[in-house]
Amino acid sequence: MNKKHLKTYKNVYSNPVKSDILWMDIEGLFRALGADISEGNGSRIRVKLNGERAVFHRPHPDKTTDKGAVKSVRRFLENARVKL
């Protein structure tokens, strides 16, 4: 994991919740953590990490992630027992 992934991880857990995290940075974090990512229908992606599964919707046309999605990513990482 590089500095960019660590920064994204910290941004996901920052309070108040950020709404300006680029989705591609979150996907990069998933990959750096060893997640399996597969394409779903439309702009959905399926993510599996440490036995935990989730489906996320890529934001469009904006590339930033809204607060609700950031909270979902946070819950997913917690359920997957990711700690840095």
Question: Where do the protein language model's features map onto the residues?
Answer:
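Basic nucleic-acid-binding interfaces
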Residues: 1-84
